[in-house]
C-alpha cells in the first residue's frame, strides 16, 4: 500500500472517529434525560424496609397531615411547551428518638382525583429515617396541579415531620430542579 493511500485512510478513519465522538457528545445528554419507565404498582414497604421499624404498641395520641404540591408537568414558553418532571416525595422523621407512623401517602391529579395510594397499611418510620415515593418523568397522570396528602401519627409529643417534593426534568440542554415544601393541613375558619 502506498504512503499516500495510507495517509488518506488514516485521515478518513480519524474523521469518522471525530464524527462518532461528536455524535456521542450530542446524544449522551439526551439519553441521560430520557424519561424513566413507568413502573407497575410499587411496594413502598419493601423498597423502604431499611427505614421502617415495628408499629408502636401504644395508642397513637398525636396526628397530623401534610398537603404537598407536586408538578409532574409544567407549562413553558407562554403555554406552548409542556415539560415533564420526575417527582420524588420524601417524608422525613425529624425525631431523634421516636418512631413516626405514616398512615397514608396518596397522589392526586389537577382535578383532585386520587391517582395512586402508596400504602396498604400504616408503617412506622425509624427516628431520623426517610421514606420516598418516586413518580417517573413519563407518568404525567398528575398534570400541572398534582399533589400528595401525607397523614402521620405518633404515640406522643414528636418533632414535626419534614415533607418535601423534589421535581427534576429538562428540555434540550436546559435542566431544572425545584422543591415544593409540604404544608400542614389544618382546619381554618370560625370557631
Predicted regions and their residues:
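Bacterial N-terminal signal peptides that target proteins for export
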Residues: 6-23
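Bacterial N-terminal signal peptides
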Residues: 21-31
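Sec/Tat signal peptide C-region and signal peptidase I cleavage site
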Residues: 32-38
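Terminal connector regions
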Residues: 41-44, 139-191
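Short, solvent-exposed loop/turn segments enriched in Ser/Thr/Gly
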Residues: 81-88, 146
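Asparagine-centered strand-capping/turn motif at beta-strand->loop junctions
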Residues: 91-98
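Short, hydrophobic/aromatic beta-strand segments
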Residues: 98-105, 116-118, 160-162
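Intrinsically disordered, low-complexity Pro/Gly/Ser/Thr-rich segments with frequent PxxP/GP/PP motifs
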Residues: 110-147
Amino acid at each position: 500500500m502506498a504512503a499516500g493511500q495510507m495517509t488518506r485512510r488514516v485521515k478518513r478513519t480519524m474523521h469518522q472517529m471525530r464524527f462518532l465522538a461528536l455524535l456521542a457528545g450530542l446524544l449522551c445528554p439526551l439519553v441521560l434525560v430520557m424519561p424513566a419507565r413507568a413502573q407497575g404498582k410499587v411496594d413502598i414497604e419493601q423498597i423502604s424496609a431499611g427505614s421502617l421499624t415495628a408499629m408502636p404498641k401504644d395508642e397513637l395520641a398525636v396526628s397530623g397531615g401534610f398537603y404537598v404540591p407536586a408538578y409532574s408537568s409544567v407549562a413553558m414558553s407562554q403555554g406552548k411547551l409542556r415539560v415533564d418532571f420526575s417527582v420524588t416525595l420524601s417524608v422525613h422523621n425529624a425525631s431523634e428518638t421516636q418512631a413516626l407512623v405514616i398512615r397514608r401517602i396518596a397522589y392526586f391529579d389537577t382535578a383532585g382525583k386520587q391517582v395512586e395510594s402508596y400504602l396498604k397499611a400504616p408503617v412506622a418510620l425509624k427516628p431520623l429515617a426517610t421514606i420516598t415515593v418516586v413518580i417517573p418523568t413519563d407518568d404525567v397522570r398528575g398534570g400541572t396541579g398534582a399533589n400528595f396528602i401525607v397523614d402521620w401519627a405518633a404515640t406522643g409529643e414528636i418533632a414535626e415531620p419534614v415533607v418535601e417534593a423534589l421535581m427534576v426534568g429538562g428540555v434540550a440542554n436546559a435542566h431544572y430542579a425545584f422543591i415544593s415544601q409540604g404544608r400542614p393541613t389544618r382546619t381554618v375558619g370560625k370557631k
